[in-house]
């Protein structure tokens, strides 16, 4: 039975989810390395603005101040922090502790270096947030538009899966699946397309949707993701959102240069704008704050998988390289960057 929960990595999403679970009565501790943020959370609570305006009392601590063991870890640290955060988590786990990774990219293989596969679950999240400062985050989606999917790394449907789902249900709506890697590739497709383009242009997801020329680029990036996923032997799951399913494989699997721009815009208007229209890529937020971004865990994950599968991804490689250059200060993010991409 799950009694103690630790949420590792209390950024924009972690603060919101942790606050909602705290409000629902769960014994959860928000863990973070940002001292000012932890102090603000403990002193004044989690301030959530944007889609709602509420301050929720929470319990928070620094990673090196964790005490005892926890039954459930909601792992929301950036992949760039794994080398530090994972050993800290393992130190406070026991033989039955469950780890639910809500990270971007394809994080489970890395988590499995520290935790047995049968204790790992994955939870791609379908809502966004923007960190505002110590103790405060901007929620881009109203609570009734907050969704996530959940599955075990082994693909089994266990009693623990149901228990974790019941807990997460108090923070956002949960859809269960026996195809976690298919879920991961669905979310990775979304992030590698929209987050990457947001990072090089500075546009929010909604501003990308507003521009047909940007959505044409999204179509090309999405097609490359689909081809890599298929070549890797993975069946991509539909995107579960607003109690409906959206099939990226059908949308972005187009021949030649005939990108389905109108269809892509219509689908994004329906499934993405309600919850993510105001979202700004987390990679861009990291760059703006002088932090290392997850460029190698998002577009880089597609590039790595493409190399292993023998699939060409020329557009993804270009945007991945561009983000690296922006991160190094060799370029600045601006809308004009999108037109430097050669679509083929």
Model-predicted regions and their roles:
Residues 27-28, 47, 173, 235, ...:
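Residue-level detector of anion-binding/catalytic polar loops
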Residues 92, 114-117, 136-247:
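Internal alpha-helical scaffold of NAD(P)-dependent oxidoreductase catalytic cores
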Residues 55-138:
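Rossmann-like NAD(P)(H) cofactor-binding subdomain of soluble oxidoreductases
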Residues 1-53:
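NAD(P)+-binding Rossmann beta1-loop-alpha1 motif at the extreme N-terminus of oxidoreductases
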Residues 219-344:
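NAD(P)-dependent Rossmann-like dehydrogenase/reductase catalytic/cofactor-binding core
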Residues 2-4, 71, 146:
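Nucleotide donor/acceptor-binding cores
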Residues 36, 80, 106, 159, ...:
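Conserved active-site and cofactor/substrate-binding residues in soluble primary-metabolism enzymes
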């Amino acid at each position: 039975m799950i009694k103690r929960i630790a949420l590792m990595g209390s950024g924009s999403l972690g603060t919101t989810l942790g606050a909602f679970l705290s409000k629902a009565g769960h014994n959860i501790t928000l863990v973070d390395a940002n001292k000012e943020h932890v102090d603000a959370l403990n002193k004044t609570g989690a301030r959530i603005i944007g889609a709602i305006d509420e301050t929720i009392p929470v319990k928070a601590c620094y990673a090196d101040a964790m005490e005892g063991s926890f039954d459930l870890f909601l792992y929301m640290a950036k992949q760039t922090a794994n080398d530090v955060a994972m050993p800290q988590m393992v130190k406070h786990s026991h033989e039955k502790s469950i780890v639910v990774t809500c990270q971007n990219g394809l994080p489970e293989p890395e988590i499995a270096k520290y935790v047995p596969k049968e204790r790992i679950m994955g939870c791609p999240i379908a809502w966004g947030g923007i960190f505002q400062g110590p103790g405060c985050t901007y929620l881009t989606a109203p609570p009734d538009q907050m969704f996530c999917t959940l599955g075990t790394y082994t693909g089994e449907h266990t009693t623990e899966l149901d228990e974790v789902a019941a807990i997460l249900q108090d923070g956002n709506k949960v859809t269960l699946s026996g195809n976690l890697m298919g879920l991961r590739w669905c979310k990775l497709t979304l992030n590698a397309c929209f987050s990457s383009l947001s990072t090089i242009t500075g546009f929010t997801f909604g501003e990308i949707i507003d521009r047909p020329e940007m959505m044409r680029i999204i179509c090309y990036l999405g097609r490359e993701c689909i081809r890599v996923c298929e070549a890797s032997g993975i069946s991509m799951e539909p995107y579960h959102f607003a109690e409906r399913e959206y099939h990226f494989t059908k949308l972005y699997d187009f021949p030649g240069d005939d990108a389905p721009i109108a269809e892509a815009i219509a689908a994004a208007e329906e499934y993405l704008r309600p919850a993510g229209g105001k979202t700004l890529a987390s990679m861009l937020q990291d760059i703006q704050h002088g932090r290392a971004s997850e460029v190698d865990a998002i577009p880089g994950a597609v590039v790595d998988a493409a190399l292993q599968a023998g699939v060409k991804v020329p557009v993804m490689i270009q945007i991945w390289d561009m983000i690296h250059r922006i991160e190094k200060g060799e370029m600045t993010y601006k809308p004009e960057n999108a037109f430097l991409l050669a679509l083929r």
